[in-house]
Amino acid sequence: MDYRLLEIVACPVCKGKLNYDKDKQELICKIDRLAYPIKDGIPVMLEPEARRMTMEEVESCRSQS
């Protein structure tokens, strides 16, 4: 994942900042609790493709940032 891309790309729902989860290969929107998959190195920024995160997952991401 190119970290320069993270400066440009935003959540398609709220236009907020995304965080990269290297282990799960996802871009995380903490505001909307959505995890967008990265397939073959390409972020899939479609809301229907995003995984809904639990509150525990979001809190875990917050403690790691």
From Swiss-Prot:
InterPro entries: Trm112-like
Domain of life: Bacteria
Gene Ontology cellular component list: cytosol
Family: Belongs to the UPF0434 family.
Entries under HAMAP family matching the protein: UPF0434
Protein name: UPF0434 protein VF_A0426
Organism lineage string: Bacteria, Pseudomonadati, Pseudomonadota, Gammaproteobacteria, Vibrionales
